[in-house]
């Protein structure tokens, strides 16, 4: 459990450094008002719940039978989000969900298929919104931030599009570079077991792709998942809207959705834990219409900074605590089950 505690503490580091080295204080952060802050938290939790419901929906529809209760499936999705939000590039939660599904006798390939559909839904909706945000930023003269957003979004979208196309036509296996790294750091028997298990799961995933991508039923399921994903992003945008509107009366939901989608894309760079620091900078750069590299003093004195930090606490740190509690509950239930 130590890594989880460390991850939470590290995620707070950018906020702590901001309090130390800038004029921003705790009072400034909560000057947005208690009611808007609570509303921002609720919208952020709604986003998490919609993603959890999407997982439950995909599991029920793709399997065609109940693998567990709705509450348990939603709890697993929420708990796994803690792992997602405490690793670089928002990865790791998928492994938790695959492991949970396989322990409940779901074939590894089908479990990987379900989580891959979740990833694709998030990527497609998130990158499309971010691309719109980048184009609008360019149109408004914010060349630097617009270009950065478009480049990152295009790379992520292109990568996953290639994965989808390849998986639907070929059997993908682990690249030789990765297998060599695994064999270098793990013992022969253990590394072979991991590589064989992973390659089998990937092969099953490719088989599922070929069987399902031409199915109208699958397209309908995935389309509904995309709709849920869009509403999840809309909730994230609304969480910023209720705070941002306290200083900008002309801020609309459309602008807020694009701004938060753009900041999420920047936060997906594998640099910091859960995008901490990058997400805040990305949101600030977008709403400020960044067109050149700013000085540190310009960033620290910007009027948007208080609201952005308030939003980050409401949309990330508080939900993170709830995710941690849910994950601990799942871990304790599993431990008690094993002991009994």
Protein language model annotation of sequence segments:
Residues 92-102, 273-289:
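Re-entrant/interfacial helical elements at transmembrane boundaries that shape
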Residues 80-88, 261-280:
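Transmembrane alpha-helix interface/packing and boundary motifs in multi-pass membrane proteins
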Residues 81-91, 119-131:
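Mid-bilayer segments of alpha-helical transmembrane spans in multi-pass integral membrane proteins
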Residues 70-72, 89, 93, 104-120, ...:
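Membrane-interface alpha-helices at helix entry/exit sites of multi-pass transporters
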Residues 66, 78-95, 190, 273:
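Short intracellular "coupling" helices and adjacent cytoplasmic loop segments at the cytosolic face
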Residues 128-141:
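Transmembrane helix-loop junctions at the membrane interface of multipass transporters and ion channels
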Residues 1-78, 136, 144-267, 293-340:
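Predominantly cytoplasmic-facing regulatory/coupling regions of multi-pass membrane proteins
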Residues 59-67, 98-109, 113:
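Transmembrane-helix boundary and interhelical linker motifs in polytopic inner-membrane proteins
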């Amino acid at each position: 459990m130590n890594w989880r505690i460390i991850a939470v503490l590290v995620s707070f580091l950018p906020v702590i450094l901001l309090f130390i080295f800038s004029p921003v204080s705790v009072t400034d952060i909560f000057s947005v008002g208690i009611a808007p802050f609570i509303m921002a938290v609720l919208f952020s939790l709604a986003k998490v719940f919609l993603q959890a419901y999407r997982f439950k929906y995909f599991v029920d529809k793709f399997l065609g039978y109940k693998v567990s209760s709705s509450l348990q499936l939603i709890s697993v999705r929420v708990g796994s989000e803690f792992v997602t939000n405490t690793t670089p590039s928002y990865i790791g939660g998928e492994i938790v969900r695959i492991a949970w599904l396989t322990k409940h006798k779901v074939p590894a390939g089908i479990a990987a298929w379900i989580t891959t559909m979740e990833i694709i839904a998030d990527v497609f909706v998130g990158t499309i919104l971010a691309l719109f945000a980048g184009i609008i930023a360019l149109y408004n003269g914010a060349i630097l931030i617009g270009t950065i957003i478009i480049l990152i979004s295009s790379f992520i979208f292109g990568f996953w599009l290639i994965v989808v196309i390849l998986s639907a036509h070929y059997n993908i296996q682990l690249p030789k570079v990765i297998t060599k790294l695994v064999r270098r750091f793990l013992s022969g028997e253990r590394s072979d077991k991991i590589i064989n298990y992973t390659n089998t799961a990937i092969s099953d995933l490719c088989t599922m792709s070929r069987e399902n991508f031409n199915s109208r039923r699958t397209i309908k399921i995935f389309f509904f998942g995309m709709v849920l994903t869009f509403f999840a992003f809309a909730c994230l945008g609304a969480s910023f809207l209720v705070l941002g509107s306290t200083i900008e009366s002309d801020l609309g939901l459309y602008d807020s959705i694009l701004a938060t989608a753009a900041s999420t894309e920047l936060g997906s760079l594998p640099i910091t834990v859960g995008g901490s620091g990058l997400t805040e900078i990305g949101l600030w750069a977008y709403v400020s219409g960044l067109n050149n590299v700013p000085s540190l003093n310009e960033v620290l004195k910007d009027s948007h900074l208080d609201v952005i930090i308030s939003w980050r606490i409401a949309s990330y740190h508080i939900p993170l605590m709830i995710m941690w509690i849910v994950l601990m509950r799942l871990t304790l239930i599993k431990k008690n089950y094993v002991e009994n």
